[in-house]
C-alpha cells in the first residue's frame, strides 16, 4: 500500500507561497493565485470572501469558543475537583493542548484557504475523510444544540410574567392544595420537567411532537438562518452583538451577585483549596476535556473561519488571544455562578432552619421568638433529654440543615441553567429583570456557537463547485437549517430531553478526539512540519518556535491518545449505558438502562463520523489503484 505522504498534494506553481515582494511581485498576497483572467482570458475566478478586518475574525472565533460550556460546565468542574485547585490542571492543559491545537487549526485554514474538506484534501487526498468527519460532527451537533436556544427562548418569553411561573407551585385540579408532583419536587423542577419538557417516564415513551416547543425550535432556526444566510457578510455583523452582550450581562450579574446575602459563602467554597484533588487523575482528564471541547477543536469551524483571512494575518496572536479570553471567561463566569450559588444555598439553609424552628415551636408550645438559629442546637438537645418520647415522635420530621451539603450539591448542564439559576432568580428582588437578562445571555451564547457550527457546515458545501453551481449561498443555508429543524423536532417530543442527553453525551467525544489526532499527524508527518513551518513564515513572517513544534509533534498527540483510551475504556468498563429519567411519582430523577435501540443509535452516532476517516482513505486507495491498473492496461 502506498504511503499517504507520497501523495501529499503540492499546489500548482502559481499558488505556491511566496514571501512579500518575491516571485509573486509587490502586493501579491502570499498563497493567493495570480489573476486568473491573465491566465485564462474571459474567465473570472470566484473570489473567496474575506472578513472586513482582523477584529471581525477575532470576535467570531471568541463567539464560537465562548459558549454555554463556560457558564454551566466549568463551574461544575470547579465544584467537583477542589474549587481553585482545578485551575492548576486547567491552565496546564491550556498551555500543552488548547493553545497549540487552536493555532494548528487556524493556521491550516488560513494556509489552505478552504473549508475542512478541501483543506485536508489539499494536504493529502487520503485525508478528505477528516473534513467529512468534521462536517458530520458539526451537523449532528447543530441538530441538538439549537434545542438549548429553544428552551432559552421559552424561558425568556415566560420571564415577563409576574410572578415568574416557576416561583410557585400550581394548584391541583380540585383547588384544595398544590399539585402533588410539584410538592414532591420543587416549583423550578416542576416548571422544567412538566411545563417545559412535559417529560415522559422513560425514553421508550416518546409521545408526540409538542407544538409550543416546536414553535420555539422553528423560531430558533429562523434566527440562525438570518445570521448565516450570506456567509461572512452576515456572520461578521452578528458577532459584534453575540460576543459583547454576554460579557455585559455577566458584569451586571457579578455586581448583583456580590451584593446578595450568602454570596461570600459560595465564593469561599470555590476558592477554598482542596489539595488532595490534584492527585485525582479525573481532575486532569476533565481539565483536558474541558479545554478541548470548549474551544471547538475538530469541528471544522475554526478552519472555516481562518480560511476567510488574509494570508498575512497573524493567526498565532489570534490563537493566543482566543485561548486566553475563553479560559478567562470560564473563570469569570464561575465567580458569578458561585456568588449566585452561595445565595441559593444560604437561602435554602436558612429556610430549612426556619422550618425546624417553626416545627419545634408548635410541637412543644414554645414562646414565639424564644427559639433562634443561634440556640437551636442547644434547645434541641434540651428537648431530646427532657421530653424523649415526644421528641422521638417529632424527630422524623426534623430536617437535617447543612450549608455545606447545600454547597456540595453539584449540578451541571441544563440542571444548572434551568433549575439552579431559576431557583436563585425567583428569590431576587425584581426577579423578572434578572430572568430576562439571564436567558437573553444564554440565547446569545447559544446563537454565537450556532453561527460557528453553521459556518463549519456551510463552508465545505459552498466551496464545492458542484453544489454552488446549482444553488446560491442563501438556498444552501436555508436547506441546511430546514433539514436540521425537521430532525430537531425529535427533541420536542415528551422523550425529547432523553434523546438530547444521548446526543449530547455521545455525538462528539470520541469522534473529535480521533479527528484532532489525525489532524496533528497529518500536519506534522504527512504534510511535513518543516514544510508547514516554511509556509507560516512566508505567510506571516513569523518563525515557528520550539514550543509549537514540540506540542504539535509529540505532546498534544500523546495527550489526545491518552484521552481517547480513557474514554473508550470508560465506555467499555461502564457496561450497560444508563440515563437519568424523571419520576413524577417521587419528584426526582432515577437511573435507567438505555434500551437496545438507543444503544444502536449511540453506535451509529459514533460510527457515522469516525468511520469517515478510514473509509474515505480506503476508497481513495482503491480508486487510485484501479486508475493505475487502467493506465498500465492502456499502455
From Swiss-Prot:
Cytoplasmic side: 1-56, 107-127, 230-237, 306-319, 454-474, 530-547, 619-635
Stretches of the chain found on the membrane's Extracellular side: 78-85, 149-208, 259-284, 341-432, 496-508, 569-597
Tissue specificity: Detected only in kidney and lung.
Region (Disordered), start-end ranges: 1-38
UniProt-recorded Gene Ontology molecular function terms: symporter activity
Compartments, as annotated in UniProt: Apical cell membrane
Residues linked to a glycan: 174, 400
Protein family membership: Belongs to the sodium:neurotransmitter symporter (SNF) (TC 2.A.22) family. SLC6A20 subfamily.
Subunit: Interacts with CLTRN.
Function: Does not show transporter activity with a range of tested amino acids including proline, glutamine, glutamic acid, leucine, alanine, histidine, glycine and arginine.
Protein name listed in UniProt: Sodium- and chloride-dependent transporter XTRP3B
